[in-house]
């Protein structure tokens, strides 16, 4: 990753005067201990994007047009749907609009299908459900997510019966990575968010010398926790698509 220092410029009114403040961050000092920061940002970002679609849909619901295509098919909002799915898969963040990602039958190799499923959920719920208990739970989820200050590792949210959904064992957030369970295999979320569907280039057997070497590399990166998953693991590591096989799990 790019480890050059990054400078953040903040301009605004301070004590009645126009001021500019510069903050410099040394990215070389960043570690996986800070992995919660981008994940919190992604969660808040998803809430913001959903709210943009929901607000835009208000006019559609108020003045419906016969035969009109769902608002999520509008290129302006289709881009938002795509970004919601990308962030959800990359960071392993589930909402009521992307909970299908945890379902065993969902094909993670079909990006267009994932976009269509998310678009359907957004159109059905965020756009058209504006009253009753189904609207209340969406408001509760939005209010939590937009101001989120702690990780929601269990991906708990309020469903349309105002019950807490929190049983998503098929999605795991580990360090700055996320994994989806399919069959007897865990799949690195970056393979999904980057739409990588080709077969693994490298196969490593659990307990082999290559496996120990990979473990040492992950320890140096403080990402060794990803190898704690039971079963086979598809991992994107240093640009390589790796399959770790474990016949004993």
Feature annotation, model-predicted:
Residues 201-218, 241-249:
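Long, folded non-catalytic interaction modules
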Residues 1-182, 188-191, 195-196, 202-206, ...:
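An acidic, Ser/Thr-enriched
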Residues 221, 225-249:
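C-terminal partner/receptor-binding element of secreted or periplasmic proteins
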């Amino acid at each position: 990753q790019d480890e050059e220092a990054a400078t953040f410029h903040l301009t605004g009114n301070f004590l009645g005067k126009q001021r500019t403040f510069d903050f410099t961050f040394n990215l070389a000092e960043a570690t996986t201990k800070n992995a919660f920061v981008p994940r919190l940002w992604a969660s808040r970002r998803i809430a913001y994007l959903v709210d943009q679609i929901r607000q835009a849909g208000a006019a559609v619901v108020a003045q419906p047009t016969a035969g009109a295509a769902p608002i999520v098919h509008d290129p302006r909002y289709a881009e938002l749907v795509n970004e919601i799915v990308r962030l959800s898969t990359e960071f392993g963040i589930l909402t009521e609009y992307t909970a299908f990602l945890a379902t065993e039958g969902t094909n993670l190799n079909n990006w267009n299908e994932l976009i269509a499923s998310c678009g359907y959920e957004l159109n059905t719920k965020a756009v058209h459900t504006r009253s009753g208990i189904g609207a209340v739970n969406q408001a509760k989820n939005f209010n939590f997510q937009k101001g989120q200050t702690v990780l929601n590792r269990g991906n708990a949210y309020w469903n349309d019966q105002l019950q807490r959904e929190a049983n998503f064992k098929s999605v795991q957030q580990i360090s700055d990575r996320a994994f989806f369970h399919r069959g007897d295999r865990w799949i690195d979320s970056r393979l999904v968010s980057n739409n990588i569907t080709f077969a693994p280039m490298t196969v490593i057997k659990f307990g082999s010398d290559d496996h120990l070497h990979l473990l040492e590399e992950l320890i140096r990166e403080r990402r060794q926790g990803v190898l704690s998953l039971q079963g086979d693991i598809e991992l994107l590591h240093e640009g390589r698509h790796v399959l770790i096989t474990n016949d004993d799990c």
